């Protein structure tokens, strides 16, 4: 075997090991972490479909509805901007979904500028401040899909947000496979650059 082939093989093996470690971290974090009753529930946005929230986003919203049904004083921040191919902001579509399911409008607050998970959290912290909450001291629960919880926890820690995390399962195997594999690379990006 030539020297360049050996180097290529070593690099390939190192890349596979790195991907395996990242995927292991994603999988290990796919569980709810609930340690307190939240005063604020932040629901992270996701891509909209032409007729409203995607199935994965609906699951996030349903998870949030389940939580707030047993926490009647918790306020909800729905976070997500408007993508170039989306008919409205993710936050507005999420608010509409919650309202259609009987959630009181005074409990729902929109953060409609975020375009990334880090922005979802950072901008939602600003909404919390505008509502009179201290993001560092206030009990918070962040809702996303289960594949996304490891990175969500990492970003919360880096932003100083002490938050529980609630994960909704993915609606089907195909989207789960894609999301879990994509998340390993997103985790690497945030580990290195955020």
List PLM regions with ranges.
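N-terminal membrane-anchoring alpha-helices
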Residues: 1-39
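Short, intrinsically disordered low-complexity segments
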Residues: 2-5, 59, 188
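A structural signal for short, hydrophobic/glycine-enriched beta-strand patches
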Residues: 23, 27-180
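A transmembrane-helix-recognition feature enriched in membrane-embedded lipid enzymes
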Residues: 176-194
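Generic low-complexity, intrinsically disordered sequence content enriched
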Residues: 13-16, 69, 102, 191
């Amino acid at each position: 075997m030539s020297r360049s082939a050996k180097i290529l093989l070593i690099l390939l093996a190192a890349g596979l090991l790195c991907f395996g470690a990242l995927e292991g971290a994603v999988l290990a974090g796919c569980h709810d972490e609930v340690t307190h009753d939240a005063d604020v529930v932040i629901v992270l946005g996701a891509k909209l479909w032409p007729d409203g929230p995607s199935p994965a986003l609906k699951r996030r919203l349903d998870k949030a509805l389940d939580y707030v049904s047993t926490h009647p004083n918790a306020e909800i921040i729905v976070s997500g901007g408007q993508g170039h191919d989306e008919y409205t902001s993710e936050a507005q579509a999420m608010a509409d979904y919650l309202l259609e399911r009987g959630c009181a409008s005074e409990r729902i607050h929109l953060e409609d500028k975020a375009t990334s998970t880090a922005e979802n959290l950072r901008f939602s912290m600003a909404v919390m401040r505008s509502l009179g909450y201290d993001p560092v001291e206030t009990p918070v629960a962040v809702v996303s899909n289960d594949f996304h919880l490891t990175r969500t926890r990492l970003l919360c820690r880096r932003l100083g947000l002490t938050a529980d995390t609630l994960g909704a399962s993915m609606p089907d195997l195909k989207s789960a496979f894609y999301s879990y594999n994509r998340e390993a690379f997103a985790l690497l990006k945030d580990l290195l650059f955020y």
